[in-house]
């Protein structure tokens, strides 16, 4: 198994720290609004990576944080005259709602910054004691020049970073690149007591503390969007390694951005398409196909055309599964060389820097083969293909999850009853009632098709 490591800028063989266990940290959202499809890409990609690691036999311990102390959250709480926790807790709940609708599994741990303030204060005290941080008027800053390897992750020297990076110009700091570990409280802001006075944690220190407290000193994988490489991940790496003297992360994985009208999709600019709107219009599987059809490190240009195409592909696959389930049995096929060959192709694809486009291409190829096998009445081959798709390949990528399909069985039985009722109405020439049933079903996303051999149905997304 090989991954492109942002730190080395090379594809490297994956070797976990502790045999059989992968410790994985993914940067989560700052919770001050509803998430958009740009936020959803790392959710889908790294959920699929976690599933694949488990498929390959690893035990994965995954942590994804919530940043619930931040200027944007505080500003919104002031705007609406509510406590900052009312804002953060509201949007954490909305995040879980969207995450469940998308079919992304919850991480093992979902820490919030506000729950780790004592540990953050302790870490800052240790950095001060090691001469990596200094106090100015109640603020605490990390001294970038105290850490010679600063810039390793973003592959830029300190002078290059000073010339072109987004840095906070502040007269209190000894160096413009130095960053805040602790911010002194301003009037009306939430605060915590500390040795340096009332204040709150800076952005970067929270991830270092939460990740190492929950996963240990050295993480196997740290993942997030490429926009976090600098300054966030660079700063995380510096302060963590300055604190422990050990390697913070073995493999840094970063996904490409989603472009919307040519620019990065971002809440702060308003250049967004909300995830729940996309889910309502296209469905979870269409969005996952859209994300996974591009290599995770490549940018994706958002377009209605691309999402519509992904929705059609999802419908086609779903209809194929429905057809098999209505015509054939669910026996477990015997393993043979053909199954092992396809499984090897799937594994080789994802072992190669998690190449989901190649894995998806195999899934699409097998869906076509499954339809041909059913057309030919070849139950043996159909069963083998269905098993690989339904029980192995699709679940690994989080597609067409079985729990969701199991919940749909009662819906499918009800639709069949309505089709029978409608057939009786048509036989009695009660066409107005028959058409009403068709119309009502279409409004809830079910389209009936009257064929010479009888009525069939499909699930549609845009109604």
Curated annotation (Swiss-Prot):
GO function term, MF aspect, one: ATP binding
Q: Which organism is it from?
A: Pseudothermotoga lettingae (strain ATCC BAA-301 / DSM 14385 / NBRC 107922 / TMO)
Tell me the cofactor note.
Binds 1 zinc ion per subunit.
- Catalytic reactions on record: tRNA(Cys) + L-cysteine + ATP = L-cysteinyl-tRNA(Cys) + AMP + diphosphate
Which superkingdom, per the lineage?
Bacteria
Family to which the UniProt record says this protein belongs? Belongs to the class-I aminoacyl-tRNA synthetase family.
Record keyword Zinc present: yes
Gene field: cysS
* InterPro entries tied to this protein: Cys-tRNA-ligase (IPR015803), Cys-tRNA-synt_Ia_DALR (IPR015273), Cys-tRNA/MSH_ligase (IPR024909), Rossmann-like_a/b/a_fold (IPR014729), tRNA-synt_1_cat_dom (IPR032678), tRNAsynth_Ia_anticodon-bd (IPR009080)
Keyword list, A-Z: Aminoacyl-tRNA synthetase, ATP-binding, Cytoplasm, Ligase, Metal-binding, Nucleotide-binding, Protein biosynthesis, Zinc
What Enzyme Commission number(s) apply to this enzyme?
6.1.1.16
Q: Which residues bind Zn(2+)?
A: 27, 207, 232, 236
Q: CDD domains attached here?
A: CysRS_core
Please give the HAMAP family that the UniProt record associates with this protein. Cys_tRNA_synth (MF_00041)
- Enumerate the Pfam families for this protein: DALR_2, tRNA-synt_1e
Q: What class of enzyme is it?
A: ligase
Q: Which GO terms describe its cellular component?
A: cytosol
Between which residues do disulfide bridges form?
Answer: none
> Which protein are we looking at?
Cysteine--tRNA ligase
A Gene Ontology biological process annotation? Answer: cysteinyl-tRNA aminoacylation
| Subcellular location(s) per record | Cytoplasm
Binding sites annotated in the UniProt record for ATP: 267
- Chain location of the short sequence motif 'HIGH' region per the record: 29-39
Instruction: Note the subunit structure.
Output: Monomer.
For the motif 'KMSKS' region, give the residue ranges. Answer: 264-268
């Amino acid at each position: 198994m090989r991954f492109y490591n942002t730190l080395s800028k090379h594809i490297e063989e994956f070797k976990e720290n502790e045999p059989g266990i992968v410790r994985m940290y993914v940067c989560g959202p700052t919770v001050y609004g509803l998430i958009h499809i740009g936020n959803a890409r790392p959710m889908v990609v790294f959920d699929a990576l976690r599933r694949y690691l488990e498929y390959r036999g690893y035990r994965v311990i995954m942590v994804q944080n919530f940043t619930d102390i931040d200027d944007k959250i505080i500003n919104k709480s002031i705007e609406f005259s509510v406590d900052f926790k009312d804002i953060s807790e509201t949007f954490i709940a909305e995040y879980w709602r969207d995450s469940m609708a998308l079919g992304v599994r919850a991480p093992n741990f979902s820490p919030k910054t506000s729950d780790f303030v004592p540990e953050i204060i302790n870490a800052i005290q240790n950095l001060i004691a090691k001469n990596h941080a200094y106090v100015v008027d109640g603020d605490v800053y990390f001294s970038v020049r105290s850490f010679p390897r600063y810039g390793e992750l973003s592959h830029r020297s300190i002078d290059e970073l000073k010339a072109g990076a987004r840095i906070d110009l502040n007269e209190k700091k000894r160096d413009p690149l130095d960053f805040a570990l602790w911010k002194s409280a301003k009037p009306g802001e939430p605060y915590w007591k500390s040795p340096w006075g009332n204040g709150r944690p800076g952005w970067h220190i929270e991830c270092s503390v939460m990740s190492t407290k929950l996963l240990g000193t050295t993480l196997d994988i740290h993942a997030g969007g490429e926009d976090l490489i600098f300054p966030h991940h660079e700063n995380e790496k510096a302060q963590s390694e300055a604190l422990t003297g050990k390697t913070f992360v073995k493999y840094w994985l970063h996904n490409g951005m989603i472009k919307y009208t040519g620019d990065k999709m971002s809440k702060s600019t308003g250049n967004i398409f909300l995830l729940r709107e996309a889910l309502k219009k296209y469905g979870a599987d269409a969005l996952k196909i859209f994300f996974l059809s591009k290599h995770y490190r490549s940018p994706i240009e958002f377009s209605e055309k691309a999402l519509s195409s992904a929705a059609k592909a999802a419908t086609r696959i779903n209809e194929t599964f429905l057809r098999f389930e209505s015509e054939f049995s669910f026996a477990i096929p015997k393993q043979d060389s053909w199954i092992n060959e396809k499984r090897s192709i799937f594994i080789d694809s994802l072992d190669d820097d998690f190449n989901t486009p190649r894995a998806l291409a195999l899934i699409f190829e097998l869906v076509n083969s499954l339809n041909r096998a059913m057309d030919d009445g070849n139950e043996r081959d159909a069963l083998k293909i269905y098993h690989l798709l339904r029980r192995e390949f699709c679940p690994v990528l989080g597609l067409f999850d079985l729990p969701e399909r199991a919940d749909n069985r009662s819906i499918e039985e009800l639709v069949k009853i309505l089709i029978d009722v409608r057939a009786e109405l048509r036989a009695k020439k009660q066409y107005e009632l028959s058409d009403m049933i068709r119309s009502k079903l279409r409004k809830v996303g079910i389209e009936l098709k009257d064929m010479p051999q009888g009525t069939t149905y499909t699930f549609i997304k845009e109604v």
